[in-house]
């Protein structure tokens, strides 16, 4: 009678950190995992000015290809010339694009049914259903966790801030993206001067709009009222002109003490208000947080409650204007 086969014993490498139950079948996987606890990056990139570090040699090698542009894994499918840095990415591409181009991953939770092109996207989505937040912040003293790597990365900026990258000698670090953008505008903004007439502007958008006035051939909007030959480079300008000049409609009044100016368009009033208080911060209305139920169902009461606005609400021409006014707004005349 033959001896019974001894069952195979699989060795596991267990994380030694408290409150962590992670275990792996290979030692290098455990070593890479431990770096999440210690914050170490034992494989730094040696390219000058890069400064990135990685937890495994494989990740460093893959990253190095971003500097060299090397993509050794080529797709051999007919009429496909794409290349990839790793075989894993090539296999994923081949599966999605050539074997199962219509393959979708559907969420199996009740009353959900959302579909995704990638399995990883489905997996991250399902954390919403299970209320899991497996991506933990490693910053000392911070115990927050998140349902996706992107949310964790966004949170980590709270600790790291936004260092100025415009000038190597600039030591500014913004606490928020808005603060960082304000710094760029104040300290590193490029000159916005018209190279034709030397006029200065607050930003590139205003300069771009102004430059249209110097174009030999440009799209203009001509006032359709009899005896008026005014033209404008924007619909907004023509709308404002007709309302204020021909219709004498200026419903938006400035509330600043001693001012009393009136305007045909709310945008004009907002722009004028800055002359009284240039440092006034534009306060954004906080976006209401969606409940878990609304996120899972996709229900958006705001969208459903929207009703078409009237022409006057949209800042368009008055409904009692001449019949040819609306037509003139649509027809462009080249001056």
Curated annotation (Swiss-Prot):
Keyword Transcription regulation listed: yes
Record region (Disordered): 269-335
GO molecular function, one term: zinc ion binding
Stretches with biased composition (Basic residues): 281-292
GO biological process: ribosomal large subunit biogenesis
A single Gene Ontology CC term: nucleus
Function: Involved in ribosomal large subunit biogenesis. Interacts with the internal control region (ICR) of approximately 50 bases within the 5S RNA genes, is required for correct transcription of these genes by RNA polymerase III. Also binds the transcribed 5S RNA's.
UniProt protein name: Transcription factor IIIA
Source organism of this protein record: Lithobates pipiens
Source lineage: Eukaryota, Metazoa, Chordata, Craniata, Vertebrata
């Amino acid at each position: 009678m033959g001896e019974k086969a001894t069952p195979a014993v699989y060795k596991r490498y267990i994380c030694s950190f408290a409150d962590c139950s992670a275990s792996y079948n290979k030692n290098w996987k455990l070593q890479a995992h431990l770096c999440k606890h210690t914050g170490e990056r034992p494989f730094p990139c040696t390219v000058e000015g890069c400064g990135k570090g990685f937890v495994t040699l494989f990740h460093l090698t893959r990253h190095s290809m971003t500097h060299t542009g090397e993509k050794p894994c080529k797709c051999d499918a007919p009429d496909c010339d794409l290349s990839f840095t790793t075989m894993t990415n090539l296999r994923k591409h081949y599966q999605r694009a050539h074997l199962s181009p219509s393959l979708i991953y559907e969420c199996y939770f009740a009353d959900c049914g959302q579909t995704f092109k990638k399995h990883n996207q489905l997996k991250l989505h399902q954390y919403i259903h299970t209320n899991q937040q497996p991506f933990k912040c490693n910053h000392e003293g911070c115990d927050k966790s998140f349902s996706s790597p992107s949310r964790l990365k966004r949170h980590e900026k709270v600790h790291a801030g936004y260092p100025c990258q415009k000038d190597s000698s600039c030591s500014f670090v913004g606490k928020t993206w808005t603060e960082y953008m304000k710094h760029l505008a104040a300290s590193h903004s490029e000159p916005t001067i018209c190279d034709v007439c030397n006029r200065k502007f607050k930003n590139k958008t205003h300069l771009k709009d102004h430059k249209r006035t110097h174009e030999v051939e440009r799209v203009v909007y001509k006032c359709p009222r009899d005896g008026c030959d005014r033209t404008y480079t924007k619909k907004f300008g023509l709308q404002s002109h007709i309302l204020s000049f021909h219709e004498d409609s200026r419903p938006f009044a400035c509330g600043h003490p001693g001012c009393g100016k009136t305007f045909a368009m709310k945008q004009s009033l907002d722009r004028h208000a800055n002359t009284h208080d240039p440092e006034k911060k534009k306060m954004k209305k906080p976006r209401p947080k969606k409940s878990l139920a609304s996120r899972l169902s996709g229900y958006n009461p705001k969208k459903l409650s929207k009703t078409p606005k009237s022409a006057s609400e949209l800042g368009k021409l008055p409904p009692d204007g001449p019949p040819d006014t609306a037509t003139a707004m649509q027809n462009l005349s080249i001056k």
